[in-house]
Regions:
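Short, positively charged and aromatic/hydrophobic N-terminal segments
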Residues: 2, 11, 20-31
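Short N-terminal alpha-helical targeting/association segments
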Residues: 12-18, 42
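N-terminal beta-strand-loop-alpha-helix module at the start
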Residues: 80
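Alpha/beta enzyme core
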Residues: 39-73, 83-105, 111-221, 229-250, ...
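Short hydrophobic "strand-cap" motifs at the C-terminus of beta-strands
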Residues: 224
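Short, compositionally biased "basic patch" segments
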Residues: 29-43
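Short, charged, intrinsically disordered terminal tails
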Residues: 255-262
Length: 263
């Protein structure tokens, strides 16, 4: 007796969700596998990229364009503010491109309950990944218990989907960067991420290298903020980044193709 999935939409949706989860887990297994930039192809570089649009004045038309670029170039994901998650999920339906939503963006200063609610809403709307901003004030005050509890709440609310924690490296001392990376690993999140791109600075090679040294070889490290050209993207990967967040994704991949064609 055969089961007709087309007559069982609930089962079909469950199967789709399962395959998305498996795909996400598979990507995490390779989170620490940094490619050799000398042999990196444009397609492989595209698979590092969260194609990002987080401007306050982004319109529905801008989001459509973002998704079209992601489909064409096969970027790993599209990263947007929470209000656009549903539209992005619809635009990317039938593709392998994931949907990522920011939470607590860009300051990270709202309550933990608010971040939890925002995370749950994003997952309900179809997000496959969450990029949450850390509460920097609590971290700087030495309230590690608060920071860890808040991050664990977000991880729980994400319901096993990967969580990336934005630590805003430009506002931290070296010691704080090390401490917060350790907290992120302990929280159950899957990535530590450099920056929002909305503060006083973005990703640096030195910060990415320090983050990689702190979290170890198998944990995800995402570089974001100020990555606008191919050489910067490659430098971040060489330093240990396993994901890149950028709005200049198309130019970055095109730049690598041009470098390869020039020999």
């Amino acid at each position: 007796m055969q089961l007709c999935l087309s007559q069982c939409p609930g089962v079909l949706a469950g199967v789709s969700t399962l395959f998305n989860r498996i795909d996400g887990i598979e990507s995490l297994l390779h989170a620490g596998a940094v490619m050799d930039k000398q042999t990196l192809t444009p397609a492989q570089l595209a698979a590092y990229i969260d194609h990002t649009l987080l401007k306050a004045d982004a319109t529905a038309k801008d989001i459509e364009k973002l998704c079209a670029e992601a489909r064409e170039n096969q970027f790993y994901s599209v990263c947007v503010n929470g209000s656009w998650v549903g539209q992005v999920r619809h635009c990317l339906e039938g593709t392998s491109v994931k949907v990522a939503s920011v939470v607590g963006f860009p300051l990270g200063a709202m309550s933990g309950d608010a971040k939890r609610f925002e995370t749950e809403a994003a997952i309900d709307d179809g997000a496959h990944e969450i990029d949450v901003v850390l509460n920097l004030g609590r971290l700087k005050a030495g309230d590690d218990k608060y920071v860890l509890r808040e991050l664990r709440d977000v991880v729980e609310a994400a319901d096993e989907w990967p969580v990336k924690v934005i630590i805003e490296t430009c506002l931290l001392t070296r010691e704080e960067k090390i401490r917060v990376c350790q907290l992120v690993v302990e929280s159950g999140a899957k990535f530590v991420k450099t920056s929002t791109g909305f503060s006083t600075g973005g990703a640096t090679v030195d910060d990415v290298r320090l983050m990689r040294e702190t979290v170890g070889p198998k944990f995800g490290v995402k570089a974001s903020g100020g990555i606008r050209d191919t050489q910067t993207a490659l430098a971040m990967i060489e330093a240990g980044a396993t994901r890149l967040g950028t709005s200049a994704s198309v130019a970055i991949v095109k730049g690598l193709a041009e470098i390869k064609s020039d020999g």
